[in-house]
UniProtKB/Swiss-Prot annotation:
The gene is aspS. L-aspartate binds at residues 170, 216, 439, 475. It catalyses: tRNA(Asp) + L-aspartate + ATP = L-aspartyl-tRNA(Asp) + AMP + diphosphate. InterPro entries: Aa-tRNA-synt_II, aa-tRNA-synth_II, aa-tRNA-synth_II/BPL/LPL, Asp-tRNA-ligase_1, Asp-tRNA-ligase_1_N, Asp/Asn-tRNA-synth_IIb, AspRS_core, GAD-like_sf. It comes from Thermosipho melanesiensis (strain DSM 12029 / CIP 104789 / BI429). Catalyzes the attachment of L-aspartate to tRNA(Asp) in a two-step reaction: L-aspartate is first activated by ATP to form Asp-AMP and then transferred to the acceptor end of tRNA(Asp). This is Aspartate--tRNA ligase. Homodimer. HAMAP family: Asp_tRNA_synth_type1 (MF_00044). Residues 194-197 are annotated as: Aspartate. Belongs to the class-II aminoacyl-tRNA synthetase family. Type 1 subfamily. ATP binds at residues 216-218, 225, 468, 520-523. Coiled coil: none annotated.
């Protein structure tokens, strides 16, 4: 037996027990010849005491940090003045025997030290000993267990779908896997199980879920990885409202299992409302500061900057806040919004009178805003003008978020969840001069008889604290509608059959109305763990350039392997060398 208890288990009730503990040496102190050792495992830490007269004293002199040891001893109550806030802080173990299970070289850093992320990822086995990282993975486990518990209780079946499948690009690049047996042909790793889960609905499995590994060869950010985990869910014979209601309950249950209370009812905003009020389709509403349309207060202005915009049917929008403002801060904000296409930023604050660098030109307009919105002393209004409403909303939305994060960080612990619905069905691709599906081409449109740019989709995103944690839609279950959608996005019948023939065929054999959602599990855990990057909730993540620092992947392979796959490496890329024989 290596241990009778773990390092986070012993309490005052265990005093006088003979115990065996195993773990890592976290700290060693020598006080007056007495050795104090903190022993650590994933459950916690326990203080060990080795007296000079102990049979274990000699070996305790040799120990180093991060060595793995086994100790035998008796549980004692600590003197009151030495008790700590540790969960085991009321006791210590007086050691009479130490066995070294494994020595450790001096590590490049110790668990919990502040070092670069590259170093943490290279020596991930050291980094994962940090109690913060272990806490994150424990949260991940609890949320995964909760998700399965909820879905199993609601009659969902967990079904696995293939990793090696057909390349059907969904926006990002596919990761391709060459076939050895089918020379010159490639599998693709799935960007999502989208078509397989819809085929499961056609097959009669009316409630499906899967913890799906998904792969996308795209540029990475703090919340992106080339491989990531989705909780993939699909249902048959359901309306959109039924999906949204059940998935709200799902989210409340999963987050509730890790101590996070979500709202009893999630608000629903249309895409257009979200953009108008928050300048984002992923609004973080915790900060308030909704965007306001101030255009009417400036219709008679002679101030050239605004007058020119209004003559081109533009708008004036902004938001009201209470932050301290100065010319220096306003100048920083102005440079920020210029990155989003605005020419500048206007502002005023209400002290005993209106204070603004543009007050002599716009004071009457500012007075109207003060009166209409009943502004109090200390109020600050940030506003801008532009002829393109989308640019205006997006820029002010980004500024609103910047102000919220910098000045109202006490709201970070609040949780706000909502649905965004009524997304545009299509978006215009400038480079290819055509419409393409905003979500994917299997989303059900609301009305195909409208102008293409006005068509809305039965699509929905779940937003938590300004992050999209889930997205889905009602799917097309009519082969004629699916054919029409392919035509609208510029796919010929031949191209559609080449890419999706197997799926188009399935639509001919009795398809139930169905819809679903996919939750970004890594992102959900990162919110619950309150970390900035999903790399901190994944055991072995890639860097922002897609490299595994631990293993060195991706790496070169032997020439023999390439020949078996009929692949030749050449400067600038990979060439498929077809073997005619």
């Amino acid at each position: 037996m290596y241990r009778t208890h773990n390092c986070g288990e012993l309490r005052k009730k265990d005093v006088e027990k003979e115990v065996i503990l195993s773990g890592w040496v976290d700290r060693i102190r020598d006080l007056g010849g007495i050795k104090f050792i903190i022993l650590r495992d994933r459950y916690g830490k326990t203080q060990l005491v080795v007296n000079p007269n102990s049979p274990a004293y000699e070996i305790s002199q040799e120990l180093g940090r991060e060595w793995v040891i086994q100790v035998y001893g008796k549980v004692l109550e600590r003197p009151d003045e030495t008790k700590t806030e540790m969960v085991t802080g009321e006791i210590e173990v007086e050691v009479n025997k130490i066995k070294v299970l494994s020595k450790s070289d001096v590590p490049p850093f110790y668990p919990g030290e502040n070092v670069s992320e590259d170093l943490r990822l290279k020596y991930r086995y050291i980094d994962l000993r940090d109690e913060r990282m272990q806490k994150n993975l424990i949260i991940r486990h609890k949320m995964a267990q909760a998700a399965r518990e909820f879905l199993n209780k609601h009659d969902f079946l967990e079904v696995e779908t293939p990793y090696l499948t057909k390349s059907t690009p969904e926006g990002a690049r596919d990761f391709l896997v060459p076939s050895r047996l089918q020379k010159g042909k490639f599998y693709a790793l799935p960007q999502s199980p989208q078509l397989f889960k819809q085929i499961l609905m056609v097959s009669g499995f009316d409630r499906y879920y899967q913890f799906a590994r998904c792969f996308r060869d795209e540029d990475l950010r703090a919340d992106r990885q080339p491989e990531f985990t989705q909780i993939d869910i699909e249902m048959s014979f359901v309306k959109m409202d039924e999906i949204l209601d059940l998935m709200e309950s799902f989210a409340r249950f999963v987050f509730g299992k890790v101590g996070i209370k979500l709202p009893e009812k999630f608000d629903r905003l249309s895409y257009e409302e979200a953009m108008e009020l928050y300048g984002s389709d992923k609004p973080d509403r915790r900060y308030g500061m909704q965007l306001q349309d101030f255009t009417n207060y400036f219709v008679n202005t002679e101030f050239k900057v605004i007058k020119n915009v209004l003559e081109r049917s533009g708008s004036v929008k902004g938001f009201i806040t209470t932050i301290p403002i100065s010319r220096k801060i306003a100048s920083q904000f102005e440079e920020f919004v210029k990155q989003y296409g605005l020419g500048g930023l206007l502002w005023f604050k209400l002290d005993d009178e209106i204070v603004s660098p543009t007050a002599k030109f716009l004071k009457e307009s500012y007075k109207k805003i003060v009166k209409e919105y009943n502004l109090d002393k200390g109020s600050v209004v940030l506003l801008a003008a532009h002829e393109n409403r989308e640019i205006l909303n997006t820029a002010l939305g980004a500024l609103r978020l910047k102000v919220g994060k910098e000045y109202f960080n006490e709201l970070e612990k609040v949780f706000d969840a909502l649905w965004i619905v009524d997304f545009p069905f299509l978006e215009w691709n400038e480079e290819e001069s055509r419409f393409e599906a905003r979500h994917h081409p299997f989303t059900m449109p609301k009305n195909l008889e409208q102008k293409l740019e006005d068509i809305k989709a039965y699509a929905y995103d779940m937003i938590l604290n300004g992050m999209e944690i889930g997205g889905g839609s009602i799917r097309i279950h009519d082969s004629e509608v699916q054919k029409r959608v392919f035509e609208i996005i510029g796919l010929t019948e031949e191209e559609a059959n080449e890419k999706f023939g197997f799926f188009i065929s399935a639509l001919k054999y009795g398809v139930p109305p169905h819809g679903g959602i996919a939750f970004g599990f890594d992102r959900m855990v990162s919110i619950a763990a309150n970390v900035a990057s999903i790399r901190d909730v994944i055991a072995f993540p890639k860097t922002s350039s897609g490299i595994c620092q631990l293993t060195g992947a991706p790496s070169t392979v032997e020439e023999k392997q390439l020949k078996e796959l009929s692949i030749q490496i050449f400067k600038g890329g990979i060439e498929n060398e077809r073997n005619e024989s």
